[in-house]
Regions:
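Single conserved hydrophobic/aromatic residue that forms the stacking wall/gate
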Residues: 1-12
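PLP-dependent enzyme catalytic core of the Aspartate aminotransferase-like
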Residues: 145-149, 157, 172, 176-221
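Active-site PLP attachment segment
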Residues: 26-80, 84-88
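Short acidic loop-to-helix transition motifs that present clustered carboxylates
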Residues: 16-20
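Conserved small-domain helix->loop->beta segment predominantly found in fold-type I
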Residues: 100-159, 163-168, 184-188
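General beta-strand structural signal in soluble alpha/beta enzymes
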Residues: 13-15, 33-36, 75, 114-116, ...
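Short, well-ordered beta-strand elements within core beta-sheets of diverse protein domains
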Residues: 81-90, 137-145, 197-202
């Protein structure tokens, strides 16, 4: 943040994961906070849109750019996002509670490393605890497994998780991040026998989700 200030550049933060409910970037000194309204804001995966919150210092510049580009959100999307925002706090707290229970279950398995800040010693916990007031439903699993087909079977055998790239809606989703490129695997610090699976924990009963994951884990060999 200080380095960016010295370079006289704008400091921008993508706040989609925690939303402003759990993280307030402008109060931390950021110039802009971007959120994909397609996700938690709407909450039903039926909207295309985004939001941009800015500091007073850059407001006039952003307003001028907005007038030039003429970007506008459609009335139907605006209505659905506004409706979703009314229940954002209730939904996010449920996502967090469900995710903590799922994370606690998954932490038992030595072949799975959780990429989720749910307790002391977990991934990025110190930084998360310093700036965030809560965690959302998106998490990553580093699965240690020599056979990639076993990972695919694990993903495909999940019955309560839809397969999809987006997230932030009411439903639970899974995505197998098949990184075959050497550079990408290096970025995620994946060993040859490690595979990345992304889970979004939705609003379903957490005991049902855990039972579903448990039956799917038997495919990991």
């Amino acid at each position: 943040h200080r380095l960016i200030r010295r370079q006289r550049q704008m400091c921008i933060r993508d706040s989609t994961w925690g939303t402003p409910y759990y993280l307030k970037p402008i109060k931390l000194g950021f110039d802009m906070s971007i959120v994909s309204a397609t996700k938690y804001y709407s909450g039903h995966s039926d909207v295309m849109g985004g939001s941009l919150a800015v500091s007073k210092k850059v407001f006039s510049k952003v307003k001028a750019a907005e007038r030039i580009t003429g970007l506008r959100l459609g009335p139907d999307d605006a209505y659905l996002i506004t409706r979703g925002l009314r229940t954002l706090d209730v939904r996010l707290d449920r996502h967090r509670e469900n995710s903590e229970k799922v994370a606690k279950f998954l932490s038992r398995f030595k072949n799975i490393k959780l990429l989720y800040p749910y307790k002391k010693g977990s991934y990025n916990y110190k930084m998360w605890k310093k700036y965030y007031s809560g965690a959302s439903g998106l998490m990553g699993l580093k699965i240690k497994c020599k056979n990639i087909s076993s990972v695919r079977k694990f993903v495909n055998s999940l019955k309560l998780f839809g397969y999809g790239y987006s997230w932030g809606g009411f439903e639970s989703l899974v995505l197998h991040q098949e990184h075959r490129e050497i550079g990408t695997r290096k970025f995620f610090k994946l060993a040859k026998d490690e595979h990345l699976v992304r889970l979004h924990i939705g609003l379903e009963d957490p005991s049902d989700l855990i039972a579903d994951i448990k039956q799917a884990l038997k495919h990991l060999k």
